UniProtKB/Swiss-Prot annotation:
Protein family (similarity comment): Belongs to the EF-Ts family.
Compartment(s) of residence: Cytoplasm
GO cellular component, as recorded: cytoplasm
Covalent S-S links between cysteines: none
Protein name per Swiss-Prot or TrEMBL: Elongation factor Ts
Annotated GO MF terms: translation elongation factor activity
InterPro entries in alphabetical order: EF-Ts_dimer_sf, Transl_elong_EFTs/EF1B, Transl_elong_EFTs/EF1B_dimer, Transl_elong_Ts_CS, UBA-like_sf
Organism: Enterobacter sp. (strain 638)
């Protein structure tokens, strides 16, 4: 068998744009013949997938699945809403979800490695970059989920709650975007950052520092309530807080996860003229 040198792998990477491991694998299969490796990569769609890999995948789906006291939430991205609704893309995402819950896989890199060949083939077929972005799990006595279309997904774990209550809590979390369960759960880092912001605002009003600090204390209590689930007004009955709702049912929320498609991903905005110009350069 021919020796697969680093320089050979480097050359194939430069010519195809594919990843190092993909290039090495292709060269091994082609017994060191770089032209055959390129031909095989073209047939498999690896080159097309590599070219699409640089495209921003900020659309896609959020999926959830519960098995008893264990739940999984997954985000799989594509580039457009059109592909997010494609049957092939959705089937791929659901297959990844099934594998994640069956194997209790919460390491996204493990899922990526497991489904890389299928992902590459789908990219070649659909013509958009596809990315298994993130996965997380939750466990608890009672689990509930809610999906707002395929763009927002929530998992909730609770004690002493029935299925209807956890469903309502999941819907609340989807709408109100809490970051923590209780006000006391808000991290010291988040509290300190907000405290400094509020103190600067109060000081700019010309108040003495002692008065400004007292003003900020009140604002901070309001802030920790706003960013925590139990401190928020319940969306289905704003006359009571989520904490009051839980007390009425003698229930407690032990955790939740909320995913929204593309959050934290910077989309590339391209105007029509620029898009036409870009296409003309490719032709």
């Amino acid at each position: 068998m021919a020796e697969i040198t680093a320089s050979l792998v480097k050359e194939l990477r430069e010519r195809t744009g594919a990843g190092m491991m993909d290039c090495k694998k292709a060269l091994v299969e082609a017994n060191g013949d770089i032209e055959l490796a390129i031909e095989n990569m073209r047939k498999s769609g690896a080159i097309k997938a590599a070219k699409k890999a640089g495209n921003v995948a900020a659309d896609g789906v959020i999926l959830t699945k519960i098995d008893g006291t264990y739940g999984i939430i997954l985000e799989v991205n594509c580039q457009t809403d059109f592909v997010a609704k494609d049957g092939g893309f959705q089937a791929f995402a659901n297959k990844v979800l099934d594998a994640a819950i069956a194997g209790k896989i919460t390491d996204v890199d493990v899922l990526k490695a497991q489904f890389e060949e299928e992902r590459v083939a789908l990219v070649a077929k659909i013509g958009e970059n596809i990315n298994i972005r993130r996965v997380a799990s939750i466990e608890g006595d009672v689990l509930g989920s809610y999906q707002h279309g395929a763009r927002i997904g929530v998992l909730v774990a609770a004690k002493g709650a029935d299925e209807e209550l956890v469903k309502q809590l999941a819907m609340h979390i989807a709408a109100s975007k809490p970051e923590f369960v209780k006000p006391e759960d808000v991290s010291a880092e988040v509290v300190e950052k907000e405290y400094q912001v509020q103190l600067d605002i109060a000081m700019q009003s010309g108040k003495p520092k002692e008065i400004a600090e007292k003003m900020v204390e009140g604002r901070m209590k309001k802030f920790t309530g706003e960013v925590s689930l139990t401190g928020q007004p319940f969306v289905m009955d704003p006359t009571k807080s989520v904490a009051q709702l839980l007390k009425e049912h003698n229930a407690d929320v032990t955790g939740f996860i909320r995913f929204e498609v593309g959050e934290g991903i910077e989309k590339v905005e391209t105007d029509f003229a620029a898009e036409v110009a870009a296409m003309s350069k490719q032709s």
